[in-house]
Design a protein with these regions (language model features):
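Catalytic cores of processing enzymes, dominated by hydrolases/peptidases
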Residues: 1-97
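His/Asp/Glu-rich mid-to-C-terminal helical/loop segments that flank catalytic regions of hydrolases
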Residues: 96-117
């Protein structure tokens, strides 16, 4: 039997992304944002992804992109029918340490959960 998912509110698919779009990417040669959130155009409510973007922008002190350059990957598209999903892409930039990015991400996610749930 599968896991009981009734208490799970949102699935998160989190990755890092290159600072500059590689040749075969949707944005070849372009500088990417620090954070890109994707909902596959509907795998989570618009209010949620907007709220998450706002919470992350507060802690990172940078604008957060939504569905640019990514619109959601295989996991968000495949499982978005079962429950809400969001994809989070974090830049591999050296402008911020991994510890800073991790701490800000956790703070932003906590703010989001307190706001939405």
């Amino acid at each position: 039997a599968g896991a009981d998912t009734r208490s799970i509110k949102l699935g998160i698919d989190c990755h890092t992304m290159s600072v500059i779009g590689p040749p075969l990417a949707p944005d070849p040669g372009r500088k990417r944002p620090l954070i890109c959130l994707s909902n596959g155009n509907g795998t989570c409510p618009e209010e949620w992804i907007s709220s998450l973007a706002s919470c992350l922008a507060i802690v990172f002190k940078e604008q957060v992109a939504i569905n640019t350059p990514f619109r959601g990957g295989h996991i968000t598209r495949s499982h978005g029918v079962e429950m809400p999903w969001v994809q989070i892409e974090i830049s591999q930039t050296d402008a911020y340490s991994n510890a800073f990015k991790r701490n800000c991400m956790l703070d932003g996610l906590q703010r989001f959960c307190h706001t939405v749930f």
